[in-house]
Structures are given as C-alpha cells and as structure tokens.
C-alpha cells in the first residue's frame, strides 16, 4: 500500500503538529515505490483504480510515464476503473492513455459494496480452480479423452 498526500486536502493538514516536510518525504518515498510496482505490470499485470477520481489516476499516469521514460518496457497489462460514475481523469489516465498501444482497459460502473465482493469472489473461485489442477497440467480441449 502506498499513500499519496495532496497537501491541504485533508483536515489533519491544518493540525499544528502536522509536518509538511514529513508528509512530503513519505509521499515521495511512496511515489518511487509505486513507480517500481507499476514497472511490474508489464506482460500481464493488472491495475485497479477503485473510486479515486483525481489523485490516484494522476499518480498512476505519472508512474507509467516514469517507467517508460527510463526505457523500461511496460505493455500488455490490464487496467480497470471501478466507480459508481465514470469520470474524466480515470477514463483518460487509467484506462486510455496507459493501454493505448497495447493492453486492455475495463470500466466497471456500479456500487462498490456490490462490485468489490463480486470481484473478490471471482478471483477466489479462479484461484481455487487453478489450485485444483496439478502443476503443469493443461486443459485438454480435444474431443478425445
């Protein structure tokens, strides 16, 4: 988990003991960590933006740009935006721009309290199904048994 603080956006920033220096320092550390994780999406990774309409879509697009501008390959991954209303920034910065040359983008519109448990159940079922097959086993798609 990473935290990307937008100074002045949370009530705690007005507290006399809040340290802009410390918040900035750990946010920068987390951005670098996030860039490293974004680089691991290449070749089949999945990035989910769940309910963030402004900050995370911007951070994600910048992380993708950092990875690519450093000369690293970042293609063939999937992005998904889950929200009850599709907004401009997630559509552009999560779905369209990062995957425009390769990859897949999925927009799921609905209530989080319904979609997230359904997504978790689907992932769990998929993992259980893959664990049921012996390692190295392939599905036999021919009609011969």
Predicted segments with their positions:
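Short intrinsically disordered, low-complexity coil segments enriched in acidic
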Residues: 1-3, 142-143
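Short, conserved beta-strand edge motifs with alternating hydrophobic and charged residues
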Residues: 2-6, 47-51
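A general structural motif
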Residues: 3-6, 21-39
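C-terminal functional extensions of proteins
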Residues: 33-36, 43-46, 53-144
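Conserved short-loop catalytic and cofactor-binding motifs
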Residues: 19-22, 51, 107
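Glycine-rich phosphate/pyrophosphate-binding loop at beta-loop-alpha junctions
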Residues: 12-18, 61-62
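Active-site rim beta-loop-alpha module in soluble metabolic enzymes
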Residues: 4-14
């Amino acid at each position: 988990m990473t935290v990307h603080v937008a100074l002045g956006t949370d009530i705690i920033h007005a507290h006399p003991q809040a340290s802009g220096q410390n918040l900035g320092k750990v946010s920068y550390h987390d951005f670098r960590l996030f860039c490293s994780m974004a680089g691991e999406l290449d070749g089949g990774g999945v990035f989910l933006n769940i309910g963030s309409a402004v900050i995370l879509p911007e951070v994600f697009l910048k992380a993708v740009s950092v990875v690519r501008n450093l000369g690293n390959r970042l293609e063939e991954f999937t992005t998904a935006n889950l929200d009850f209303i599709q907004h401009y920034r997630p559509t552009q910065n999560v779905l369209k721009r990062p995957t425009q040359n390769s990859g897949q983008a999925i927009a799921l519109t609905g209530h989080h309290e319904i979609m997230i448990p359904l997504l978790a159940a689907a992932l769990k079922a998929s993992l259980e199904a893959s664990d049921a097959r012996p390692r190295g086993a392939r599905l036999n798609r021919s009609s011969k048994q």
